[in-house]
Amino acid sequence: MTATKPSPKSMLSLDLGKRRIGLAGCDPLGITVSPLPPLQRKSFERDLKVLQWHCTSRKVEGLVVGLPLDAKGLPTDQARHYERYGQRLARALKLPLALVNEHSSSWAAAERYNLQGDRSGQLDSAAAALLLEQWLREGPELKPVHVAAHPVSQVNSDSGS
């Protein structure tokens, strides 16, 4: 599937993990991407409350969620789980969603920001920032969640950061 460069807008990017969610946002023009403090996961309800605050305060117009595809761009079990979780969050937040290939994003973020071995969550948010930069360059366009926001089989596999 060929992705098209989306029109810039205020976005929130999520690098999902079992213990933390790395967060990054961009301005409405898509010029500045900033890592945000990571979210320490507790429960879906608490995650949602924190994300709702970010979405309201930043006037977010859509979510970008990274999926850990394998080296060939094929979905992993974890990617399928994160796709469902991202869709659940997008539905609850009433926001459109874009799914992007996050293969190697943590490695690339560790290299770029010298965060090898980080356990504070900064690496997760740095990876979320790379995912958002990738989305701003390559897409795909946001989709309403009820449209089954481009199933994992249609995520642009050329883009692993």
UniProtKB/Swiss-Prot annotation:
CDD domains: YqgF. Disulfide bonds: none annotated. One of its GO terms (cellular component) is cytosol. SUPFAM superfamilies: Ribonuclease H-like. GO terms for biological process: rRNA 5'-end processing. One of its GO terms (molecular function) is nuclease activity. Belongs to the YqgF nuclease family. Could be a nuclease involved in processing of the 5'-end of pre-16S rRNA. This is Putative pre-16S rRNA nuclease.
